[in-house]
């Protein structure tokens, strides 16, 4: 019975995915993923990216956010991206494949960032979802805490942080933590984010000294 339910749910997801207007637009424009549109909407409202910036992209594959960031920071900007999954090359993106939770991968990522601080850290990381919120939410919160730790390590004063978070247990506490570190914090639900999804995007600007 459980397999039948999972099969029906998977079929429903596939049908919804391939009829999604943002998926269709992404395919038409040759974009890596529909996530490109989420970041574009955030940029239109919050003006995060500027030419010459250095950006760290966590959970980058298949590359929608990296692709968008490169288009905004111009040739003298830089994107350093990391994901457990492989990602086809993008001009202007330094990609590291590996598990961000692994100490060796984190060390390599920090070496690629170098001594200079970055202007933006963004994370679209999400765990493999089981469909059980009691399992999925803690896994998700662990990843977003790691992303915030990256901000503490590499983000410049006045820098910005964009992170996907699934609403549930621990969300309010995480939001308070971000507010203690940044001057301006907003919660965004882009149109390209499916309405029934628990995901929201926290956009934090003005990292405090």
Swiss-Prot record:
GO terms for cellular component: cytoplasm. It is found in: Cytoplasm. NCBIfam families: PRK11188.1 (NF008390), rrmJ (TIGR00438). SUPFAM superfamilies: S-adenosyl-L-methionine-dependent methyltransferases. It comes from Photorhabdus laumondii subsp. laumondii (strain DSM 15139 / CIP 105565 / TT01). Keywords: Cytoplasm, Methyltransferase, rRNA processing, S-adenosyl-L-methionine, Transferase. This is Ribosomal RNA large subunit methyltransferase E. It is an enzyme of class 2 (transferase). The active site is at 164 (proton acceptor). One of its GO terms (molecular function) is rRNA (uridine-2'-O-)-methyltransferase activity. Specifically methylates the uridine in position 2552 of 23S rRNA at the 2'-O position of the ribose in the fully assembled 50S ribosomal subunit. InterPro entries: RNA_methyltr_RlmE, RNA_MeTrfase_FtsJ_dom, rRNA-MeTfrase_E, rRNA_MeTrfase_gammaproteobac, SAM-dependent_MTases_sf. It comes from the Bacteria. Belongs to the class I-like SAM-binding methyltransferase superfamily. RNA methyltransferase RlmE family. It catalyses: uridine(2552) in 23S rRNA + S-adenosyl-L-methionine = 2'-O-methyluridine(2552) in 23S rRNA + S-adenosyl-L-homocysteine + H(+). S-adenosyl-L-methionine binds at residues 63, 65, 83, 99, 124. Its main location: cytoplasm. Its EC number is 2.1.1.166. Pfam families: FtsJ (PF01728).
């Amino acid at each position: 019975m459980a397999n039948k339910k999972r099969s029906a749910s998977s079929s429903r997801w596939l049908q919804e995915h391939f009829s999604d207007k943002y998926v269709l637009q992404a395919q038409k424009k040759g974009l890596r993923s529909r996530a490109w549109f989420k970041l574009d909407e955030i940029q239109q409202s919050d003006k995060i990216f500027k030419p010459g910036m250095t950006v760290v992209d966590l959970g980058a594959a298949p590359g929608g956010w990296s692709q968008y960031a490169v288009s905004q920071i111009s040739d003298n900007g830089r994107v350093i991206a990391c994901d457990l999954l492989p990602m086809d090359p993008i001009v202007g993106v330094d990609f590291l494949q590996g598990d961000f939770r692994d100490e060796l991968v984190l060390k390599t990522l920090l070496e690629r960032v170098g001594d200079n601080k970055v202007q933006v850290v963004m994370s679209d990381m999400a765990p493999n979802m089981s469909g059980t919120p009691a399992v999925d939410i803690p896994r998700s919160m662990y990843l977003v805490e790691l992303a915030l730790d990256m901000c503490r390590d590499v983000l410049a004063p006045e820098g910005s942080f964009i992170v996907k978070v699934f609403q549930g247990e621990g969300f309010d506490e995480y939001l308070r933590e971000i507010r203690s570190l940044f001057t301006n914090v907003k919660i965004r639900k882009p149109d390209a984010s499916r309405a029934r999804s628990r995901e929201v995007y926290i956009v934090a600007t003005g990292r405090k000294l």
